[in-house]
């Protein structure tokens, strides 16, 4: 039967997930522990019964547990008074005990203590025992008492609450038996059970409290008398009433008693026991207890409860403390007890029993300030600040608290003694029930609904009989049903109660079925709850019962007046119930335990809530209301349902975090790869260059988006089902409390001088290590936060989508309040969700259109896009930034774990102010060379071929050769010096290599020489871009074809994950990439083509993942498996339903393939750091762009390897977003190579010969940026072919630069700049170059560089499909093209355009010619630009755009004369062949120029059809501003 709402709230077992405090450890219990003895006799020589650790209270009551010191009075009655009427006999006993209860009780206490001394019990300090069940489980391990040993009772000295004492069950049992014998109600309640037990709630409750629970509480007071009030701290007082105090019911095993708030005094409350069984006639001290400012309320531990309780509130008292030091005896007559007298006890720990839901009332004030309530004969009290507020002639509406009703005795009484019980109770003063309290009110208005609450409480009760029919319908319609074994018993994995991790498919079906009944509840009928000005922490939490119908939802979006929730489990809605996909929380939503206030402003993004009731949102109130619709039509913007009742499950424990602010107000958190939101009123109050410590909420990230209980073999099929439903990323964490961290900020100031003994002489080694870790970890987290690129966890609806090949163009909103501009950038990884599931992609261009308030985005889709995925048809598509999975590389303590002598630690110490590392020079005459090489590389011999005769390598370095055909190429002396330094075993060397100096060839040569020394040691070659790594692969492939016998077994691979590989453009993929080689290798392994004797290192989990990968990618039919693989498949096939684990697959691949050289980008290197072992050398290309955090990760993982950094400090430093600045940027991104060269930290060699550019270009750049140190390695003739062949285009063929003056104005686009006239000029030039009938240029040989990201996006769209690469200056570092078109865009030359390193990169990309488009007057006045412009003008290559246009049109090579790009693949190939045959020497590089980027033919790029772009936006949808 479906439980009603009231039953749910009454039966629910709340739990406390609040952060622990020191109050929770206060269990001040005295402990009597018996000395060890071999005897098992008690003090009377009788055997002591063994105590079962699992014995229950019922067993204790029947005598199984505990020892009795006196015979039960019933024994004598049964022998001496057997003929007496039972009622008369009991009456006689009760009267005699009642008359002498006080003296008898005190005598019993004295007798008891004497007996305890005889038993030899002692009080000792022991670990805390916090519950009844805890000391029960301990009791079986206690030694038996010895009748021969005696000792005094030593009272434990309680010095502080933090030193609790433990409970000895034997002493407790003795006290309990004494209380049982003295309590007048014992005979009246013994041996009976509570009626209708099955209908009672779980946990301690007023209606299931029993007589033996009262005995436990009274007995426990003898232990609690050691607690002293002066040892408890006073708690701070909150000024305003907190209505929604956390409430719950204590567990069954907890010793407690129920008390009611009877009186309110100035600084305390007086409580009266709810059940007279607790005190009887003999324990008047337990009749009244007080609550004061030392009382701890569960869930409200940090504040005093004074001022927050109502008269009539029920409190569960779980611990007592003596109020007065003079109290020496716990016993007193109940006749002496009075609420006006000082209480002997205070309630030191209490739990608020769940209150009734607030009641809406209509009333008028009486003359004495009370309330006369409509339709009620009983007055109510009103909380008034001033009696003058009460206007007797005005009607008011308000919210009232009504106290609970209960019987004054427990329910386990003997039925025949009921009248006797009532007679005895009449001798005890019983206080009447407290009046209800109106705590919030306002003047009456006709719109206020007073009696609606009762009417709307259960409007669906009559429809519950149809629930089974709805449930059956949902079960049959839900697409997930077939994957779950519904008939099988679905026992929850993690105990009673529902949670997000143990929810079952049947629970989802019940919730969906119940929605047909909840449709009768409407939002307009629910009252709006008042909103609190500040967030309440902690909120009350609880777990829904097993019998409660609910579903779990996650907070996805936060608005000012509502939250949007998304279902955690897709079983709830399947494909057919799109109305249940998103729900709304608004001001009418009730949170369990927080019913009196609105929950708006109290939840975090990412919070998980259990929805226990729905209501139809306003706007969906039609009687013709139809619930189901396809999930693809669901939208977070228009919710069908609101969550009218919710429960907050236990939140994750608050996390302590160290963080710094970024410019965008988000936080970089130490140890995290993603930013966090910060609750801060004003960003002006914080500084970005400081470290703060705070408390954060980290949302729970469920592993599955469907429920438990699925059929394991069908898990992969369920995953396929869920992929067809759009997913949303998890939310960022939220920091809600913080302050400056003084110690960490001191470390921050010392920073890179941590190991400087000159600047800081008194710092200990331990503190130096902490400084390094603090700075490096904060920087590491900052850099990862920036590089991961997810700064927006929102999902946006895609407007007017257009797909062309693997590129999709769409628009998303750019709201003014929370703009997307700046958070959505080129390079962001995205996920697009729609009716057919999800597909991944990467943003290529972002263009702001302020007129309509949208961003225009073009993204490249992943190649693993499902075949059926389409943007056509019904349904909406949403896009969000893809979530990044954290991959911790640096963690707390990483630096301390490094061996003091390893290369990694030595390098880090040098980077942080330690002594420079001197160059290691190997003397070839030294007989120890073999030993050194053996230590460094595991080499026994082989260095002799590099020996020189009698001189050190730094004077005459060995000549090295690069393998090539037909003859090896000799490296120049600077390149040889670099190779020799790496071979000499230096921990770290730096190769300062200007543009075009052949550094790629130098890196490969050094790697090959190391390979010859020892072939079973891996080497890592790291680049900064995929294009550069492809270049290294290209060079390595040519090396293998050189015919060198020493290299015939060389194996290399480019490491790239399968997911990233699917998103790479075609010209960035090779057949040496790991995904390609992995599929080939695993296929050979599966078919038995690989010798298995060499694969003993593989473990079972490797085999399982390999077979899963083969099946998932359909590489081999299982029928064709080799014998050994077939056995594995047959034995382990049950595990193959799971998706393959990527890291395990990579491990298996490297174990089988065993590559010698591994090429990888710096970003992808993280995936290798925990996999590769035995790496002897790491070389890093374009090292000037290497972020310091990446280098630190490499140094930590490969701490025994030698490192070679080769790059140019006169080019761009490591890339960093504008959001990162100050110390976060210095420690995370840094400029390691420049700092190392300037401060002479490591050995350096400088390459000087330039083989890329035209000699005059090299000469000009050498004078501008290198102090004239560069030497050209090529002739002018080799770089002048284009100029000489296109004299119609190029004014002066003897100078390789041309300037086109553009007078068109630029336009601001967000924080960037664009220029439409410049775009047109670029289009004209590109058309001219690639459409020339005599000398057409291959589009892949043209590069367009812009200094502004907005202009880059516009140019990319303008030239899309042409095969011409467009990019920023940063994107072009490491690349080269025959022809470069450089766009300055802005007529106002900004500071960053005048940076020497940026201009150096832009001007050094061209092998033949550079065409500059810019504003002449502006550039004449700019640094460096003025020199370049003057040189061009002196050589006659300065033209005006309009004049140049006219000249080209006279020569008939304009846009109107020739088609843009031929749509015929054959004619295009013919023109390319003709061009290549006529310009062979232009394509061929000089003999020593193997470091260039390989050309990519235009046939690899998608066909361009139609016009260029209709002024860029022609293919874009026209979005109206009203959208």
UniProtKB/Swiss-Prot annotation:
ATP binds at residues 993-1000. One of its GO terms (biological process) is termination of RNA polymerase II transcription. Keywords: ATP-binding, Helicase, Hydrolase, Nucleotide-binding. One of its GO terms (molecular function) is transcription termination site sequence-specific DNA binding. Residues 1-89, 1463-1498 are annotated as: Disordered. It is an enzyme of class 3 (hydrolase). The keyword ATP-binding applies. GO terms for cellular component: nuclear body. Its EC number is 3.6.4.-. It comes from the Eukaryota. Residues 1463-1476, 1485-1498 have a biased composition (Polar residues). InterPro entries: Coronavir_polyprotein_1ab, DNA2/NAM7-like_C, DNA2/NAM7_AAA_11, P-loop_NTPase, SF1_C_Upf1. Belongs to the DNA2/NAM7 helicase family. This is Uncharacterized ATP-dependent helicase C05C10.2. It comes from Caenorhabditis elegans.
